[in-house]
């Protein structure tokens, strides 16, 4: 029945509990069913699912589907325990945020999640910025033409400094390898 998309019916509370299960299949199915539901604790639940199984691309897809418009909240939740977030997870989440969130929200992310005060290690910041750059590429904010991640923080000194710092760190990291 599950292969046809027919899941056992469960309450939101049951699904949130199942998302914390030790069984990866139970976690995955609960996460899939959480898509389209709103709950204030959803970002924390989704972050815990990612922490338990972020290496699995299907789990990541289920989490990102369930996050929908709460992708920025999910990123904020992941930042509370930054060592658990995998680079590929941050890159994918950054791409989703870059494609769908408004310009002001993206600028806020550049200010809060990058630079010296961020909880993320530099490799995570590079992965997140790469994803944001992929997502933002070609978007048209306020009729300004197609945007790149380099153009987004113009006129925002803190966001610009944070972005520049990540590019410098990425170049240094590439040279050191």
Could you say what each language-model-derived stretch is?
Residues 1-177:
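Long, ordered, helix-rich scaffold segments
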